[in-house]
Design a protein with these regions (language model features):
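Electrostatic, structured charged patches in enzyme active sites and in nucleic-acid/phosphate-binding
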Residues: 1-199
Length: 199
């Protein structure tokens, strides 16, 4: 994916998580303006921070695409003096999304700044690494035939390749969502990796 603009570090962290989350196809910033009437019947408008389109899986089989409109806010803002105004906006956004078969969600630092973010930050730099096609094929076929394995076992079984090269190729494949590991844990040589269907 390309660059998605963000207005705060929390928004940047949200994008980082979504970029590595399984099934996320689209991350759009400030996608649409929603018009609504407030309780004084004044026309107001509200622009969600992001539109996410993700593929939903059931028993590892992709079933449908889901659209989610997202607001990213610190808890202090959600509970601050603007809280009543925000709640009003969010209610209208929720109704607006529901009528169209979509979802609206609010993410705070509690949902964003988690171990999933630390893993995503670890993997992000590997996304743009050039692939080592020979090694990628060897790793994928090893996991396809042998099931989930610790990265150190993958390194041992592919002993004809330097182990640091195997490790960085595994990181690149994880960063590009070609293979899976625990989304809440940093990746080490003791991490279990697998094809998505075995995850």
């Amino acid at each position: 994916g390309g660059f998605v603009k963000f207005e705060s570090r929390l928004e940047r962290d949200f994008i980082t998580i979504m970029a590595l989350r399984r099934g996320v196809r689209v991350i759009d910033a400030q996608p649409i303006k929603i018009g609504y009437f407030d309780e004084d019947f004044r026309l107001r408008s509200y622009t969600p921070d992001f539109h996410i389109v993700r593929r939903v899986y059931h028993n590892n089989i992709p079933t449908h695409l889901e659209s989610i409109f997202v607001e990213v806010k610190f808890t202090s803002e959600l509970n601050g003096p603007k809280s009543p105004d925000l709640i009003g906006k969010f209610k209208h956004a929720q109704r607006w999304a529901k009528r169209r078969g979509w979802r609206f969600a609010v993410y705070s630092e509690d949902e964003i700044r988690t171990p999933e973010l630390h893993r995503a930050e670890q993997l992000m730099p590997f996304r743009r690494n050039p692939e080592n096609t020979k090694l990628e094929t060897a790793i994928a076929s090893l996991l396809r035939t042998g099931g989930p394995k610790l990265i150190q076992n993958v390194q041992q079984e592919l002993g004809n390749f330097p182990s640091n090269l195997v490790f960085s190729e595994v990181l690149r494949m994880l960063a590009n969502r070609q293979i899976a590991s625990d989304p809440m844990s940093l990746v080490t040589e003791n991490s279990l990796v697998s094809m998505w269907q075995d995850f």
